[in-house]
């Protein structure tokens, strides 16, 4: 049985330890409270240095066994895909209707696609120019992963990069993509938090900002203040409610895997790699079908939204921490300088676009722009953390808009998300797809009257 702990159970143990360390540091250190760094980010950064120093492993009867970054990359992939099963089971919260909310959600979805396109072109352009001027043996298409890493986060980036490496034998895509995603979290906090407070001082916010509660800053609830986070839908004499929800998600994930294998074995070469690479999409698809069927047979009450959110949130925390430990510094050395340049230029471009369109938004411009900056450098959670600074009680509808925007993005973002796996195909017009999105988006927003005179 000893051998079964290596490498994945040992890796999960390390992730858990770093999450606990991150939780303690967030609760005690003012710097991390000021910049709202979550425990998963703090723990991941620590884990990154421990792993790349060669200290990370587990003891065994034959001695110390080192755990490699590949193990954590694999864990990242599965946590991301499993979390999407939970997303598919979730129902949108009530109160998401209304003209302003729908317009705001569409506004965010359009800028989301624009930012991905601009970031990707900045990354690719930087890698191309560097290789032209200084040479190097690396695939410049990996620069496109700046857009995926910043805008879509580590899980989706992992999916794209895995397809590139397994189907087209592109080297170092996974490492570069995860590094872009990891640095994006830092950008969201280091740039986004000062921007939020600057906006408050300048009076750019729509509502009067309040003081953030200590429990929010520390990341730990006060003694006696323990809100309920789930409802039981089964009797514990039969099956625990959390076990029941996990059973549903595990079954759906298994179905997604089976479908992915079928795709891999039956589809033509070149697109068959999407079978496993897009397992997160298949999982979400089967989860949405399962939810519809349960509603049809009057069983939907057995799915508790809060339980599903907690399980999905747990996968995200473990995933973010694992992302940093999936990065190998040695493999980044060849592209280190263009990588840093791309991150800086991409961050500046993201900041400019968010503020430019935010100033001209029909309403709640700063809140939308700030939230989008966090979203399109980190994750949706990063964006909502920044929003909480300027809108502590979520009096504006922006938080709801962020959730609803996925409805629009599901349709609007398809040309990009379904094209990214084919970037390594010679002659594939990925660059021109990004150019088209970049040109069409502002024109569309203008005709939809989403661009007004600057409000701040």
Annotate the PLM regions.
Residues 1-5, 12, 198-243, 295-299, ...:
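Intrinsically disordered, low-complexity non-transmembrane regions of multi-pass membrane transporters
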Residues 18, 45-52, 70-102, 284-294, ...:
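Hydrophobic transmembrane alpha-helices of secondary-active transporters
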Residues 29-36, 60-73, 90-110, 295-309, ...:
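Interfacial helix-loop-helix linkers and transmembrane-helix boundary segments
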Residues 31-34, 91-105, 131-140, 162-175, ...:
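Juxtamembrane helix-boundary/capping and inter-helix hinge elements in multi-pass membrane proteins
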Residues 93-124, 181, 245, 249, ...:
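Entry/N-cap segments of selected transmembrane alpha helices
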Residues 118, 126, 134-170, 195, ...:
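Alpha-helical membrane segments and immediately flanking helix-loop junctions
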Residues 249-357:
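Transmembrane helical segments that form the transport core of multi-pass membrane transport proteins
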Residues 319-322, 327-329, 339, 344-452:
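C-terminal transmembrane helix pair
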């Amino acid at each position: 049985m000893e051998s079964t702990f290596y490498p994945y159970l040992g890796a999960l143990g390390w992730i858990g330890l770093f999450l606990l360390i991150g939780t303690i540091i967030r609760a005690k250190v003012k710097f991390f409270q000021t910049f709202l760094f979550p425990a998963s980010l703090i723990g991941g950064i620590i884990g990154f240095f421990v792993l790349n120093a060669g200290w990370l492993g587990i003891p065994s009867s034959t001695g110390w066994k080192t755990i490699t970054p590949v193990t954590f990359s694999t864990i990242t992939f599965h946590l991301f895909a499993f979390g999407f099963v939970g997303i598919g089971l979730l129902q949108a919260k009530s109160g998401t209707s209304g003209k302003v909310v729908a317009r705001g959600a569409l506004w965010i979805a359009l800028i989301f696609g624009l930012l991905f396109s601009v970031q990707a072109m900045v990354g690719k352009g930087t890698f191309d120019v560097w290789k032209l001027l200084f040479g190097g043996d690396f695939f410049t298409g990996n620069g496109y992963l700046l857009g995926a890493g910043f805008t879509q986060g580590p899980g989706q980036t992992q999916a794209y990069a895995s397809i590139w490496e397994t189907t087209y034998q592109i080297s170092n895509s996974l490492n570069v993509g995860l590094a872009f995603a990891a640095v994006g979290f830092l950008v969201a906090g280091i740039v986004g938090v000062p921007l939020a407070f600057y906006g408050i001082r300048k009076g750019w916010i729509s509502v009067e900002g309040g003081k953030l509660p200590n429990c929010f800053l520390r990341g730990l609830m006060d003694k006696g203040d323990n809100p309920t986070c789930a409802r039981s839908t089964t009797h514990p004499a039969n099956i625990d409610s959390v076990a029941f929800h996990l059973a549903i998600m595990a079954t759906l994930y298994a179905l997604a895997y089976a479908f992915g294998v079928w795709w891999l074995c039956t589809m033509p070469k070149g697109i068959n790699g999407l079978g496993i690479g897009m397992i997160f999409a298949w999982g979400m698809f089967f989860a949405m079908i399962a939810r519809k069927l349960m509603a049809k047979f009057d069983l939907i009450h057995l799915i508790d939204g809060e339980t599903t959110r907690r399980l999905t949130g747990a996968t995200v925390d473990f995933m973010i921490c694992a992302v940093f430990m999936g990065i190998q510094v040695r493999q980044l050395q060849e592209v280190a300088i263009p990588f840093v340049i791309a991150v800086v230029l991409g961050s500046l471009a993201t900041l400019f676009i968010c503020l430019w369109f935010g100033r001209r938004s029909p309403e709640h411009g700063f809140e939308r722009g700030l939230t989008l900056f966090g979203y399109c450098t980190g994750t949706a959670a990063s964006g909502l953390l920044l929003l909480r600074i300027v809108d502590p009680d979520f009096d504006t509808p922006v938080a709801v808009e962020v959730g609803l925007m996925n409805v629009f993005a599901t349709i609007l973002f398809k040309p990009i998300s379904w094209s990214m796996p084919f970037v390594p195909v010679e002659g594939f017009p990925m660059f021109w797809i990004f150019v088209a999105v970049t040109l069409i988006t502002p024109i569309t927003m203008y005709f939809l009257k989403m661009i007004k005179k600057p409000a701040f």
